[in-house]
């Protein structure tokens, strides 16, 4: 259609020389999906944790304003069970503000070596102080200091300003434990929707989505 010649430069898809896996992942039967998607998530996580790559628990977290304006960033999964997927962050950040106003979110895991994607979406709730305190106590001290020094997502005049705040926090808590800031804590994303995606040659991928219905799951296979 039309006579205009495209001037776009496209990213070429070339064969990627990924290192071979040291184990054989167990394939999922997309024709007969498992009854329990939570157990299948845990199996996929267990296999991803065996990858020779850093942060296999990294996930893209998507939130939005009440007007539907989206934003996304990478966070780390810190706990997972039948109640949901847990991560921690500054609650006064942009994502914290959006979750307070519009408490729903979706996360996406992408494990290139396994040819897999996993999506989890649902309502979001804040963890209580006890759980947030317990996790904060396990963090490296430098990370604890950073939680005090950074007004996440706020304008910053210079890096020197940030480093000055880091030094001030180091001096403030010299010789004592670093307490959890009141503005820092955990969130849990309910498992309302779970989608499994497995790559195959020529884009003939497998997809299956689970949607919670009361205490049951409705399963639908999707075109790729």
Predicted regions and their residues:
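Binding-site signature for planar aromatic cofactors or substrates
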Residues: 2-224
């Amino acid at each position: 259609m039309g006579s205009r010649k495209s001037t776009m430069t496209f990213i070429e898809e070339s064969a990627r020389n990924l290192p071979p896996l040291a184990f054989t992942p167990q394939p999922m039967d997309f024709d007969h999906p498992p009854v329990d998607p939570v157990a299948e998530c845990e199996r996929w996580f267990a296999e991803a944790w065996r990858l020779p790559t850093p942060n296999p628990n990294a996930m893209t977290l998507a939130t939005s304003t009440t007007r539907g304006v989206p934003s996304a960033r990478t966070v780390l999964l810190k706990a997972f069970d039948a109640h949901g997927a847990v991560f921690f962050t500054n609650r006064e950040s942009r994502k914290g503000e959006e979750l307070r106003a519009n408490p729903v979110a979706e996360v996406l895991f992408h494990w290139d070596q396994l040819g897999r994607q996993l999506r989890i979406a649902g309502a979001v709730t804040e963890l209580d102080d006890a759980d947030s305190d317990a996790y904060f106590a396990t963090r490296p001290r430098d990370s604890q200091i950073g939680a005090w020094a950074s007004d996440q997502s706020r304008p910053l005049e210079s890096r020197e300003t940030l480093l000055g705040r880091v030094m001030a926090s180091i001096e403030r808590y010299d010789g004592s434990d670093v307490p959890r800031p009141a503005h820092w804590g955990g969130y849990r994303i309910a498992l309302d929707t779970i989608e499994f995606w497995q790559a195959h040659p020529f884009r003939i991928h497998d997809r299956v989505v689970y949607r919670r219905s009361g205490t049951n799951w409705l399963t639908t296979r999707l075109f790729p």
